[in-house]
From Swiss-Prot:
Keywords: Cytoplasm, GTP-binding, Hydrolase, Magnesium, Metal-binding, Nucleotide-binding. Residues 159-330 form the OBG-type G domain. CDD domains: Obg (cd01898). SUPFAM superfamilies: Obg GTP-binding protein C-terminal domain, Obg GTP-binding protein N-terminal domain, P-loop containing nucleoside triphosphate hydrolases. The keyword Lipid metabolism does not apply. This is GTPase Obg.
């Protein structure tokens, strides 16, 4: 089974908590705060690996989580950072944000990396909060949460040469003769629902990957049938072998078949129609094909294409087509800047986060304060003593929260809520 799309959940590690600690050595009589910072959470990183060729594993495991950072230690010891989670995917995998559809990365080269979820920052230990007026801070920060998101993995098969054509023209039979692949072969539309891959061996040290691209139909570029799925797999091939049933056994006209398929390629992507294309006039073992071949060959050659008579059922002419495809493939690869393409790249994705402005509303007698900045501080500071609460109050005052509360008519003893933190207001 070839699996080319998967949806998975990834979660970066949370940052470790900072701690409250003080120096207690015998010869340090006035030991100050010495709480260490928490470690950073691990990132989630996708890496392209040419040893893989399907996304099948992601159908069975859909949740992935990187390691959390560790808590800080005494004597300003920094907590250990969480290990990054490396997720290997086949070369040719496109990663998208499932919520927005935004393309995060196109991992088309061996070793390409994409950092899609960033680990949370470690919380600061109490030594960071010492001031001239607060020399013994008894509070610290908790670590920040790591990024989390659902992503869609989409594999565009990386075959060198693709077999294209209408359903039931003999592509799967051609592939089975050309390689050791054993595709499902039957006489019905959409016989091949996933690309079948095989290795074609030309001679020692000379080979290429051949893919049977699922059958196209008229309207595929608009998504008819399984059109978009099928056309997606053609994009990465360098050479196309266009299989045409020259016998007309399916009740269609061979030249029209050829023209319609190329029109669909051009509509979907003009670049596809420009790829080198060999035409294999298949089913030459049938009498009708032999009678029609010369006329077909003449019409197609007028359009500038090479035509080869073949019979996938008997193997006749298949080897000649494969050798010619390999020659064209070498020409295409030589034309590319191989050195530049070989360098792996790193993609870094930061999911856009909604920034909420500071707002205050009265709800059932409680003043509810909301906003990205104020909520972040309320979430990160452990409010468990006078020092930490005083720090929090000073922060709210600098942010202008208390001024706005007074404008709204707050009275002593009224309740203020920020996230799950509630306190009574007093001047």
């Amino acid at each position: 089974m070839f699996v080319d799309i998967a949806k998975i959940y990834v979660k970066a590690g949370d940052g470790g908590d900072g701690i409250v600690a003080f120096r207690r050595e015998k010869y340090v009589p006035a030991g100050g705060p010495a709480g260490g910072d928490g470690g950073k959470g691990g990132d989630v990183i996708f890496v392209a690996d040419r040893e893989l060729n399907t996304l099948l594993d992601f159908k069975y495991k859909r949740h992935y989580k990187a390691q959390n950072g560790e808590r800080g230690g005494p004597n300003n010891m920094h907590g250990k950072d969480g290990e990054d989670l490396i997720i290997k995917v086949p070369v040719g995998t496109v990663i998208k944000d499932a919520e927005t559809g935004e393309i995060i990365a196109d991992l088309s080269r061996e070793g390409d990396r994409a950092i899609v979820a960033h680990g949370g920052r470690g919380g600061r230990g109490n030594s960071h909060f010492a001031t001239s007026t607060r020399q013994v801070p008894r509070f610290a920060e908790v670590g920040e949460k790591g990024d989390e998101l659902w992503v869609i993995l989409e594999l565009k098969v990386l075959a060198d040469v693709g077999l294209i054509g209408y359903p039931n023209v003999g592509k799967s039979t051609f592939l089975s003769v050309a390689t050791n692949a054993r595709p499902e072969i039957a006489n019905y539309p959409f016989t091949t629902k996933y690309p079948n891959l095989g290795i074609v061996y030309i001679s020692e040290g000379e080979s290429f990957v051949l893919a049977d691209i699922p059958g196209l139909i008229e309207g595929a570029s608009e998504g008819a049938g399984l059109g978009h799925q099928f056309l997606r797999h053609v994009e990465r091939t360098k050479v196309l072998i266009h299989i045409v049933d020259v016998s007309g056994s399916e009740g269609r006209e061979p030249v029209e078949d050829f023209i319609k398929i190329n029109e669909e390629l051009k509509k979907y992507s003009p670049e596809l129609a420009q790829k080198p294309q060999i035409v294999a006039a298949n089913k030459m073992d049938l009498p009708d094909a032999q009678a029609y071949f010369e006329l077909f060959k003449e019409e197609i050659e007028k359009m500038g294409y090479e035509v080869y008579p073949v019979s996938a059922a008997t193997g006749m002419g298949v080897r000649e087509v494969l050798k010619r495809a390999y020659e064209l493939l070498k020409q295409q690869k030589a034309a590319e800047n191989v050195e530049e393409d070989a360098k792996p790249r790193t993609f870094v994705y930061y999911k856009k986060k909604d920034v909420k402005p500071l707002t205050i509303r009265k709800e059932n007698g409680v003043y509810v304060v909301e906003g990205t900045v104020v909520e972040k501080v309320a979430r990160n500071i452990v409010l468990n003593d006078h020092d930490s609460f005083r720090y929090f109050q000073n922060f709210l005052n600098k942010l202008g929260v208390f001024d706005k509360l007074r404008e709204m008519g707050i009275q002593d003893g009224d309740i203020v809520r920020i996230l799950d933190v509630e306190f009574e207001y007093y001047e």
